[in-house]
């Protein structure tokens, strides 16, 4: 029955449509649509090791030196001192600040928007609800958040994540149908591991992902092999998965470029997590250098973006 309802949802009119540019992220610069690479500070947690973790300033310094346009912070529960420190770090290192936070109830709408405005973020990335939020409550929460952000003039992206209302493809497609202005920060890795997708996509998954890719105005870079949520894309053993993710990322970029307008930016965030996202060896150390992975992912993302620009004839190549 569930599969029948899912296939019916995929055929309903109006489910897939090009996103209007007014919902895209913008940074106020009058320029062709362009890429906006972001590195999550959390991606450097416990780096280079749990016992010798870089300071927050060192992390931001390294992120700026690597050529990212912004560093991303978790703003939920942040203090005035946190906001002041992040703003100062951004100014000192010539880099912008992106905002990620949690929305569990309508009372969370205003603080989330205030955080994005305070930090001047080009997006508000929201982790919405939990895996136990009912479909009806989730839809109401998403609809309310979309309306609140539209009124406030803040570009909203809903992160696709395990343990949230977007934890599975079936429900995420249903929300996309129910809330036409819903836009996603699409992290494919969570869907691949939640659905144990280790090989080529089946027709149901292909159809569902196509919907979410058309609705994505931001992407997260993490590679899953269908069993682990995070594996090293440089490992030849995962070449097929790397190529599959790269193709899906580029397709999403091309979908976005076809309707983007001047001043629009496409955030692509790198955020490889510390253990237990990262895999540990017998010596208790990560089996791969996570920062080197993330810098290499940035290079891959830029190559894919420039290919998408060339193939669509839209947007601006990324040259930084």
Predicted regions and their residues:
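N-terminal pre-domain/capping segments
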Residues: 19-117, 121, 299-320
């Amino acid at each position: 029955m569930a599969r029948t309802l899912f296939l019916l949802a995929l055929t309903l009119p109006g489910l897939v449509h090009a996103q209007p540019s007014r919902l895209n992220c913008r940074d106020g610069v009058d320029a062709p649509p362009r890429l906006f690479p972001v590195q999550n500070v959390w991606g450097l947690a416990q780096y280079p090791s749990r016992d010798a973790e870089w300071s927050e300033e060192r992390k931001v310094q390294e992120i700026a030196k690597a050529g990212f346009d912004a560093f991303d912070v978790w703003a939920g529960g942040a203090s005035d001192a946190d906001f002041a420190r992040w703003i100062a770090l951004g100014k000192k290192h010539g880099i912008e600040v992106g905002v990620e936070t949690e929305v569990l109830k309508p009372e969370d709408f205003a603080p989330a928007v205030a955080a994005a405005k305070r930090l001047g973020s080009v997006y508000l990335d929201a982790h919405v609800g939990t895996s136990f939020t009912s479909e009806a409550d989730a839809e109401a929460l998403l609809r309310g958040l979309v309306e609140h952000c539209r009124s406030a003039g803040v570009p909203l992206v809903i992160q696709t994540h395990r343990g949230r209302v977007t934890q599975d493809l079936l429900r995420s497609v249903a929300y996309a149908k129910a809330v036409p202005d819903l836009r996603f920060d699409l992290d494919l890795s969570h869907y691949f591991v939640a659905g144990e997708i280790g090989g080529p996509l089946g027709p149901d998954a292909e159809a569902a992902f196509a919907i979410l890719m058309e609705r994505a105005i931001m992407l997260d870079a993490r590679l899953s092999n269908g069993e682990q949520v995070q594996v090293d894309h440089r490992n030849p053993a995962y070449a097929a998965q790397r190529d599959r993710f790269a193709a899906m990322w580029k397709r999403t970029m091309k979908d976005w470029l076809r309707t983007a307008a001047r001043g629009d930016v496409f955030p692509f965030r790198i955020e490889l997590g510390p253990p237990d996202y990262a895999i540990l060896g017998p010596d208790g150390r990560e089996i791969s250098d996570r920062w080197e992975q993330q810098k290499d992912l940035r290079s891959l993302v830029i190559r894919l973006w420039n290919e998408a620009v060339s193939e669509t004839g839209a947007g601006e190549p990324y040259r930084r």
